[in-house]
């Protein structure tokens, strides 16, 4: 601190703050001197204990890792999440204990072999098949959309064609007596007539003696 008239304080020497600058993020720390020279590429040079150093290779864009810790924390958490996901997928292919975290402890570090299970191949190939079907649906949608040189492609109803093919290929067997269902439909008359008691009961009319159903 300076005394009256701008003279140095008692002791004949300047304080540490006036000699090295304000402490903190904007100034130098103990034993550091910051040069005022700024590079066109936005990195600075420091002299630490007589050794010249620069943050040219440590800066990440304008806000470096030292000035913006949230950037480092976000990337760290993202990397950990990706690693845990890969551990879970790899563990599911070789063990069926349920949780891969159990193998981090010595008392339950053994592996349970899945090679004897019949569903091993299905468990490994199912993600690939599901992703393939999902990708095919997306491609089918884009293929059906109209383009300047092509009209919209509509889906083809295949179940009607398959039903017609089955009826055309049907041949009566010997157990059926060589007859089809159409032969029986011609001999049955389902007309119950207007004077039937069933019709009166459905309409809420007084119940009368129902007429017999005629079967020709």
From Swiss-Prot:
Bias (Low complexity) ranges: 21-32
Keyword DNA damage assigned: no
InterPro entries hit by this protein: HEV_TT_vir_Orf2/Gyrovir_Vp2_N
Hydrolase recorded as keyword: yes
Extent of Acidic residues compositional bias: 172-187
Enzyme Commission number(s): 3.1.3.16, 3.1.3.48
Superkingdom to which the source organism belongs: Viruses
Region feature Disordered, mapped onto this chain: 1-50, 165-187
GO molecular function: protein serine/threonine phosphatase activity; protein tyrosine phosphatase activity
Annotated catalytic residues: 95 (phosphocysteine intermediate)
Induction, per UniProt: VP1 and VP2 are detected 12 hours post infection, while VP3 only after 24 hours.
Catalytic activity annotation: O-phospho-L-tyrosyl-[protein] + H2O = L-tyrosyl-[protein] + phosphate; O-phospho-L-seryl-[protein] + H2O = L-seryl-[protein] + phosphate; O-phospho-L-threonyl-[protein] + H2O = L-threonyl-[protein] + phosphate
Cysteine pairings via disulfide bonds: none
Keyword field: Early protein, Hydrolase, Protein phosphatase
Protein family: Belongs to the gyrovirus protein VP2 family.
Function: May act as a scaffold protein in virion assembly. May also play a role in intracellular signaling during viral replication.
Protein name (database record): Dual specificity protein phosphatase VP2
Gene: VP2
